[in-house]
Amino acid sequence: YMRLGRKIIAYMVTRTFSGLLYEMDLRLRPNGQSGLLVSSESAFEQYQQQNAWTWEHQALIRARFVAGCDRVAKRFKQIRHAVLKQSRDSHALRKEVIEMREKMRSTLLNQKPGYFDLKHGVGGIVDIEFIVQFGVLENANNHPALLVYTDNIRLLDTLNKIGFLSDSQQKGLNEAYQAYRKASHHASLAENPKMVLVEEVEHHVQLVTSVWDEMIING
């Protein structure tokens, strides 16, 4: 099965004339590159409950079942819900989210004078994602509605409905996220770096940064 898995992966990441067929990052699996390509249900549950880092629970928020039998889909949903609705210490959670964000930015930020890194820049896509993920992990224990969706747009809406985000914050983050994603898609199609001129997104950056500071740094 290991050989079969690697063969499937090789097909999926084939580069065509139109670009990469499908982007896959298997480093995010349990135990990273040293872990098995596929885990049993019980092994996956045990890892998520006992060994996973906070950033892995952040990733689990976006996880969804893609293909397979209904029984496995149902079991995955049960495990995901059980992990994400755990009661968490807000101070410790905030500290870990901030540390991971700083670590990512220090290694992945693409810097060029006059340009803004759509994904990793201060006030960019990842900051919005981390705000959403912090909100879900902090509140899912009391608000199961946060476990229904996996996409950021509907999660922003749900975070607004439970009172975590104000109307203006939800609207601003939604608009910024969609603007960033649109620009990112255009860059991908042109096979260009995912960067734009600072002045093109300055108002979005200021909004996202202010929400980050209020909800994460000073929360």
Model-found features: residue ranges?
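A nucleotide- and high-energy phosphate-metabolite-utilizing enzyme signature
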Residues: 1-219
